[in-house]
Amino acid sequence: MSAMTPAVEVENLGKNFPLVRGGLDWLRLPFAHPTKRVLNEVSFGVAPGEVFGLLGPNGAGKTTLLKILSTLLEPSTGRAALAGCDVVHQSAAARRQLGYCPGFDRAFYLRLSARENLRFYGALNNLPRRPLAERISSLLAALGLDGARDEPVRNFSTGMLQRLAIARALLHQPRVLILDEPTRSLDPTAAAWLRRHLREELAGRQGATVLVATHNLTEAEETCHRLGVLDQGRLQAAGTAKEVCRQAGAATLAEAYARLTTPEKASEEARPR
């Protein structure tokens, strides 16, 4: 891992969401609009060639943080940058450095095949046709989709769609890769391949930076160089697994996680948008 400028920079990041639900609430509250603080003064950096794991219960703010880093949301306070590009003021440049695999939103053309979908997204990234075709074949084979490469995506299972979403995120060999629970719907073989690929190939050989949100503590400990534990919008601890355990006064990562987080109350997906 490099000691150079972080590939991912997060400084005092905060995000508020309005609590009002509709037009009548705005009429009842013309001057004061209550908000919910979803992220609060979050700061950390991720180096080139590093896999950073983001842990935390549902509702902790993980998805909100990843969406800000992916330029899908703007922060209320603080700043964030990818490969030196501010995600608000240089969002187009930041997106060119980024590969993003969200937790649920697939955004595929269901009547097109897996290969046709990847060709489309490769063209959006201005990838040359011949290298793109080779890259698509390689990724589909590695992710176990080679036999379904010409099948319409509407026939894919949830796990197959997840693998295709990962292939799309990897397609243009991004400098920064952001993954939201990428192995949740994967079979053990595909999950093992992805873990190896993230640490050994992307981070180890290509020097890419990977930020992955996960609930799987064993996976996080095996795959990630460092971890951050997020709870109630605040970063409670960060460092290697051993450092996180030391900060929590715990013997294991599972014990540290239990001490650093509160019981889950509501899913993050249920909070106001």
Label for each model-derived stretch:
Residues 24, 119, 123, 130-148:
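Conserved ABC ATPase "signature" region
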Residues 173:
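Conserved catalytic motifs of ABC-family nucleotide-binding domains
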Residues 191-206:
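Helical segment within the ABC ATPase nucleotide-binding domain
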Residues 220-222:
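A short, surface-exposed alpha-helical micro-motif characterized by mixed small hydrophobic
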Residues 238-239:
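ABC ATPase "signature
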